[in-house]
């Protein structure tokens, strides 16, 4: 038998987990454990789909939608895409946690459904990356076009966008000037 060294030094009798037989499994006496109060909204609970059970049933695991397509995501704002990305990350963590628990408990079910669900989430993340890449390339192209546009000033001095008159407006101004009538131009747009 093995006895905890601290208990021997104190001269006390070992209790609970301190006294074990060699080669035996640890037997936990729940009455001797301290009850730890845990916050109901603890962040680690987000690694599990349910607070009261470690694994989802096959029906729960197979009950999921389709991945978001890039076409659907193109209309979303940056904040929406950012939120959806982190929701996907949390979902992949839940899937990985349940997969680990399933292997640990040798449950023997749910692996195929779990892989399908993970593939769905990964496809959504791939679509988010595609949309953000498209936006980045569009932004780069817009910068190149803006450098050659006389209405746009990227120097940081003064207004960014100064609209020019349309050709029709210029022709009307020339006619008005020749007749002596000049209209006031609208104020410039600043950003």
Swiss-Prot record:
Gene Ontology terms: cellular component:
mitochondrial large ribosomal subunit
Q: Which InterPro entries match?
A: MRP-L47_sf, Ribosomal_uL29_mit
According to its UniProt entry, one GO biological process term is: mitochondrial translation
Q: Identify the Pfam families for this entry.
A: MRP-L47
User: According to its UniProt record, where is this protein located?
Assistant: Mitochondrion
Oligomer and partners: Component of the mitochondrial large ribosomal subunit. Mature mitochondrial ribosomes consist of a small (37S) and a large (54S) subunit. The 37S subunit contains at least 33 different proteins and 1 molecule of RNA (15S). The 54S subunit contains at least 45 different proteins and 1 molecule of RNA (21S).
Q: What is this protein called?
A: Large ribosomal subunit protein uL29m
- The organism is Sclerotinia sclerotiorum (strain ATCC 18683 / 1980 / Ss-1)
